[in-house]
Amino acid sequence: MSAASLYPVRPEVAATTLTDEATYKAMYQQSVVNPDGFWREQAQRLDWIKPFSVVKQTSFDDHRVDIKWFADGTLNVAYNCLDRHLEERGDSIAIIWEGDDPSEHREITYRELHAEVCKFANALRGQDVHRGDVVTIYMPMIPEAVVAMLACARIGAIHSVVFGGFSPEALAGRIIDCSSKVVITADEGLRGGKKTALKANVDRALTNPETSSVQKVIVCKRTGGEIEWNRHRDIWYHSLLEVASSTCAPKEMGAEESLFILYTSGSTGKPKGVLHTTAGYLLYAALTHERVFDYRPGEVYWCTADVGWVTGHSYIVYGPLANGATTLLFEGVPNYPDITRVSKIIDKHKVNILYTAPTAIRAMMAEGTKSVEGADGSSLRLLGSVGEPINPEAWAWYYNTVGKQNCPIVDTWWQTETGGILISPLPGATALKPGSATRPFFGVIPALVDNLGNLIEGAAEGNLVILDSWPGQSRSLYGDHDRFVDTYFKTFRGMYFTGDGARRDEDGYFWITGRVDDVLNVSGHRMGTAEIESAMVAHPKVAEAAVVGVPHDLKGQGIYVYVTLNGGEEPSDALRTELRNWVRKEIGPIASPDFIQWAPGLPKTRSGKIMRRILRKIATAEYDALGDISTLADPGVVQHLIDTHKTMNAA
């Protein structure tokens, strides 16, 4: 597919949208010319206890990086997500929970959610949890995880959600870094028909002597599986709720007080605890949720992420609930019990908006039309993509097969550190180009710079930076502001460096080319791995591809590609040659792969991110330097790749 393919805004979408093109242009212009005025007006969507007088106090100067929004105002996040909705929509559904087993589901109204949050907030207070204390949440995708987050917000405790797929060692590192006082977990998790020993993992994590800050472990009963019990430390969630009052006054919190810490995955060394604060984060999550997804009251909105990632925080919990939306919480995986699961959930719950990851889209696409067999899908109005750049072929399949050419796709780009979406189409305002995140959201000023930090104008490729602050921006790394400054503001002074490369086309649309550390330098030519991967996946026999650089005597770096074929396709030397020629045709001879390794699967985190670090190590035969692979969705993939690599080398 040509990158120039353009999908204009559909007239029926433009006629009913919250934000048409003229509105977008006017609002964006105001947001960058007069950010104080723009955000002062937008902040009225929140309920304040003490109104703010000052809007924006921010500096990107690397000698004094300081980010404050609405600093003298006070409010409570849980109040904004629950209490203020009770009068008008107390009996409306807040959360639809779909269990791992298709026979399990629950609907929870705003009134019911409010009562449970108040009870659990009181229970936490009863366990000596107070404003500023850190609570670690290590739970499956069940409503109690959302309750725990909101209960912390209600009493001013800081939550640190750790994804349930992380190992005991990774969990311990995150507990130690923030001196967590309480850990909330479940007996076991359920995912894809398999049980995860969450409580046992917590027990193992807490054998580390440096986790001594933890005083209590609160355990939610999910499976009823047998677990070890420490009667001095462990408490059942349900027993706390049985005796707790459902009345709990929300704590008045300063706009810049900490709301949560979220540790970024995949980084080496000490975990990086991204810190988000109260008012700016909530405002930005709510506004982006409303405008990017063009959300209307009463619609069913489904983000398939896990609450252990920032997408789950902003677009399952805080954004939707602040807007009084109905948010769907899914415990399982897209291919269990079979590949039709996503389609069946859409029809079962009459989902209007689906926000998922390219990994899930490609998994469905690899099965052809099987994933939508027998599906109606007529409730869908809008599709979204998040987590990595989506290649044009997967975009087109998503648009044609899942959306039946009726649903715009919002291809969103953002990061844990940004708090919310920074670059994305708005359904009623933006003509779509498959593979492009298109244009910046209100208040966001993206730019491209060369490696010396010089701004690049017009159609070009470079390092993606943001020139000024926005309310959802992370304020620091927990307990390590110097590292925050060094990581994001030292590379290009006076700018926030995203770590991503991007291309801007002649229409001003942005195309994310991948992490800058995923840029190859082949014979002096810079190439994003995403570009080569997109070309490879465009081949009709290829389901997925991952590209890494390897040392090359002549070129400096060679191109090493791991290829997963579609179901029913067989690997062969002839196909290898065909794929090399295909990439030469799609991009040019410079992008021709030096090595192609067949892969039954790729090493991915549970959120679907490919762990390229592991692929690089395998490609260079550094089998003993892979690091911790326990966080992978399927650690067994790694040994298969190593064995195949050894066989290739021996041949």
Swiss-Prot record:
Coiled coil: none annotated. The modification N6-acetyllysine is found at K609. CoA binds at R191, G192, G193, K194, T311, N335, S523, R584. Keywords: Acetylation, ATP-binding, Ligase, Magnesium, Metal-binding, Nucleotide-binding. One of its GO terms (cellular component) is cytosol. Pfam families: ACAS_N, AMP-binding, AMP-binding_C. Its EC number is 6.2.1.1. Its cofactor is Mg(2+). CDD domains: ACS. GO terms for molecular function: acetate-CoA ligase activity; AMP binding; ATP binding; metal ion binding. One of its GO terms (biological process) is acetyl-CoA biosynthetic process from acetate. Acetylated. Deacetylation by the SIR2-homolog deacetylase activates the enzyme. It is an enzyme of class 6 (ligase). ATP binds at G387, E388, P389, D411, T412, W413, W414, Q415, T416, D500, R515, R526. Mg(2+) binds at V537, H539, V542. Belongs to the ATP-dependent AMP-binding enzyme family. Catalyzes the conversion of acetate into acetyl-CoA (AcCoA), an essential intermediate at the junction of anabolic and catabolic pathways. AcsA undergoes a two-step reaction. In the first half reaction, AcsA combines acetate with ATP to form acetyl-adenylate (AcAMP) intermediate. In the second half reaction, it can then transfer the acetyl group from AcAMP to the sulfhydryl group of CoA, forming the product AcCoA. NCBIfam families: Ac_CoA_lig_AcsA, PRK00174.1. This is Acetyl-coenzyme A synthetase.
